[in-house]
Amino acid sequence: RVALAARKHLQTEFSPDEEIVCVTENDACGVDAVQVLTGCSIGKGNLIYHDTGKQAFSFYSRKDGRKVRVVFKMALNREEHSRDVLKEKILSASDEELFDFTEPADLPPNKARLFSSIVCEECGEMAPEHKIRLHDGRKLCLGCFPDYSRGW
């Protein structure tokens, strides 16, 4: 429902390239529908995960500058209703009953960049240059880079 509502607000269809961008604030199952119905994907660089845990999605059209933030607002009490009842409520509600529509405060994210690959000097696997760290003069991937934490 989020993806269809966003497409309606942006007056667009499926995006085969990077014309539509989605910033999702959760990693729940609704993100799967966003990928299928909008064409946004992590691999193409036009689906960006910004973890706030909210059922909120910001959509941007690079083609014409339209944008919309869609936030799920319907209160669903899982203790009072079965899964089937909740599903029916979601499917039968209007977009306005389900969602708040506002304009995102942020600018659209930049287009995806391509980076050179660097060989990790510890494991021998390649990683993009922006994910390589220097440790004692050696280029290490994030998996081989020793954790450095001081508690904050």
PLM ranges: what are they?
Residues 97-108, 122-127:
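Short Cys/His-rich Zn2+-coordinating modules
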Residues 1-6:
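Conserved phosphate/anionic-ligand binding catalytic regions in large, soluble enzymes, centered on
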Residues 134-147:
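Cysteine-rich micro-motifs
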